[in-house]
């Protein structure tokens, strides 16, 4: 769950600049620590840094003189800690004892403990840190000293890896090796510049062609008559690079989280205008799927995507009731979850398209010949390339760890998918829903504007509070869980989301005087149940924040947010005040909401 970058550029010696810029764009993959390295005059020049409460590691790297060093070759790494604490010793790059190799790595070497024991016992090797990567570079050095090769190195590792290495004895070659973890090689138009990155967004704007390194491949990039070429075990056809426009700062907003919350109406508009054409739902991808044969759907997601999948389950069950639907956390999906005698469709939801647990589930599905659909935000990502059908979210890049606009577009995509395959709606009902969708960006913007004005009062309820509850019924239960996740993620306030009916079955014991409880309620047949919960909670002197589209007496609750809408997507509008509450709670505690502790946006380990 790390970001790696490397560059060869002999024309203007700006390799280090490219690497540092790439790391800035790859912070979504982790930011516990970071490091950069180059080689010259037979030695490595490097710097490492660790994130602290003041700044993240990339900030310290960018302010080090080495970040502006002129060189033709450089590598860089931003880390999410899996083996070993976030310390300078455990930060990448790592070096072997002889000082020959500098190596960076994304993934997990599963047999590193056995290799480490062998090196300690047979070579009396002294390790300075606790990472599997340090073991890998030590083992590489050992194998080559024993007249072994990179082939032997590749064959003897178990797990997943994307490795880049510098060799002091071959200072103009950039070595790479991949199995399971993503690795992409790109060139500029004249092949006078080469880059290796974890994802396409890490490339400089002048990279015009790329290839995705195949599993179990290894090799190097080298200079051949002033043009860089790939020498490896597999042959690659270069893919033309589309234009990637990526801002490096959240300007004019202070944080990416804030910008992405405010950008949701635009993201919604982009998705809806692609999927509703001439007032008709437009899914040409479904021409290859015969939904009349589909008997069962399994929706898979992790974290925020899991919450979106649960809401999508309700849509499909409502509009296509003859299809049964399960929602399973991608990390928990097993072969036994596939019905033996039913035609099953697998739908995978992932912002990044690289979620390791989901990719494992995809492999299982393909082994059982299931049809697969990916609902993905990042184009041409790992899962997007390997599913049978991909539906892109068109939410634009998310930089903040906490997902906002991708969640909104995931829910909308599932809503439109369910409408498209429906068996229960007539034309007038479909027209009503498509009209509601077309109006939704405007409604969403209104709720953002309204919620901003509510925030100062909401924050008062959280003064000196370390916990809160968010409750909803039916589809709003999963909005409650998503809002609760946002609060936990970026403000470090302990928050739990439940069905409003579940509170009295245990969690009620945690209520105490003044604890904030957010109630989400639609003006429907469940409203009276929410009113009962409101009374029960207030009788324990907890403070209730009521978010609803029904006009009620202000005296019935401690604080009322009335969302004036009859939209069938009211439940999705309820996420807005919760997202903004999480953001402003983080600010009130002096926390950078974009990069919460211990988290990474792209989860590429199991």
Swiss-Prot record:
Pathway: Nucleotide-sugar biosynthesis; UDP-N-acetyl-alpha-D-glucosamine biosynthesis; alpha-D-glucosamine 6-phosphate from D-fructose 6-phosphate: step 1/1. The keyword Chloroplast does not apply. This is Probable glutamine--fructose-6-phosphate aminotransferase [isomerizing]. Residues 282-427, 458-596 form the SIS domain. The keyword Transferase applies. It catalyses: D-fructose 6-phosphate + L-glutamine = D-glucosamine 6-phosphate + L-glutamate. The active site is at 2 (for gatase activity). PROSITE patterns: GATASE_TYPE_2, SIS. GO terms for biological process: fructose 6-phosphate metabolic process; protein N-linked glycosylation; UDP-N-acetylglucosamine biosynthetic process.
């Amino acid at each position: 769950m790390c970001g790696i970058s490397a560059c060869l550029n002999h024309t203007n010696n700006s390799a280090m600049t490219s690497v540092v810029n790439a790391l800035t764009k790859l912070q979504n993959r982790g930011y516990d620590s970071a490091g950069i390295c180059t080689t010259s005059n037979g030695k490595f020049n490097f710097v490492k840094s660790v994130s602290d409460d003041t700044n993240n590691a990339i900030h310290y790297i960018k302010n080090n003189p080495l970040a502006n060093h002129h060189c033709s070759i450089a590598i860089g790494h931003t880390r999410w800690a899996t083996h070993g604490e976030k310390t300078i010793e455990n930060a990448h790059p790592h070096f072997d004892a002889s000082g020959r190799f500098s190596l960076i790595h994304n993934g997990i070497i599963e047999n590193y403990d056995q290799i480490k024991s062998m090196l300690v016992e047979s070579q009396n090797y002294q390790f300075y840190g606790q990472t599997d990567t340090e073991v890998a570079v030590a083992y590489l050095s050992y194998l080559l000293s024993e007249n072994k090769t990179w082939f032997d190195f590749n064959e003897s590792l178990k797990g997943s890896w994307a490795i880049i290495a510098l060799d002091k004895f071959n200072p103009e070659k950039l070595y790479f090796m991949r199995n399971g973890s993503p690795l992409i090689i790109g060139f500029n138009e004249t092949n006078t510049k080469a880059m290796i990155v974890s994802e396409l967004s890490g490339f400089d704007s002048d990279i015009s062609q790329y290839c995705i390194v195949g599993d179990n491949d290894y090799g190097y990039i080298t200079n051949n008559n002033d043009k860089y070429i790939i020498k490896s075990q597999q042959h690659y056809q270069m893919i033309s690079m589309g234009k990637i426009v990526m801002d490096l700062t959240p300007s004019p907003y202070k944080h990416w989280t804030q910008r992405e919350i405010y950008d949701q109406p635009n993201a919604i508009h982009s998705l809806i205008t692609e999927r509703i054409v001439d007032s008709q739902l437009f899914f040409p991808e479904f021409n290859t799927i015969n939904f009349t044969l589909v008997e069962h759907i399994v929706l898979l997601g992790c974290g925020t995507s899991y919450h979106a999948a649960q809401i999508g389950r309700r849509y499909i069950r409502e509009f296509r009731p003859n299809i049964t639907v399960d929602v399973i956390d991608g990390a928990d999906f097993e072969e036994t979850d596939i019905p033996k005698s039913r035609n099953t469709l697998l739908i995978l939801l992932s912002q990044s398209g690289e979620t390791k647990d989901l990719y494992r589930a995809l492999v299982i599905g393909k082994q059982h010949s299931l049809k697969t659909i990916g609902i993905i935000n990042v184009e041409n990502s790992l899962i997007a390339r390997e599913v049978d059908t991909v539906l892109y979210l068109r939410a634009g890049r998310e930089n903040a760890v906490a997902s906002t606009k991708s969640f909104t577009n995931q829910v909308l995509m599932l809503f439109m998918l369910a409408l498209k395959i429906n068996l229960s709606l007539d034309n007038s009902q479909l027209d009503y829903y498509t009209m509601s969708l077309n109006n939704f960006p405007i409604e969403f913007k209104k709720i953002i504007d309204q919620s901003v004005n509510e925030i100062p009062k909401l924050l008062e309820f959280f003064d000196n509070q370390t916990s809160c509850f968010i409750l909803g019924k039916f589809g709003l239960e999963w909005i409650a869980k998503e809002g609760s996740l946002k609060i936990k993620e970026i403000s470090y306030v302990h928050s739990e989301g439940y069905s409003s009916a579940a509170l009295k079955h245990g969690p009620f014991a945690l209520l105490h005087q003044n604890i904030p409880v957010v109630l989400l309620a639609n003006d429907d047949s469940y409203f009276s149940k929410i009113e009962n919960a409101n009374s029960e909670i207030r009788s324990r002197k907890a403070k209730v924040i009521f978010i609803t589209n029904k006009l009620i007496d202000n005296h019935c609750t401690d604080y009322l947010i009335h969302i004036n809408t009859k939209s069938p997507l009211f439940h999705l509008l309820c996420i807005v005040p919760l997202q903004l509450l999480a953001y402003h709670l983080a600010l009130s505690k002096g926390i950078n909401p974009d990069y919460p502790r211990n988290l990474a946006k792209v989860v590429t380990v199991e």
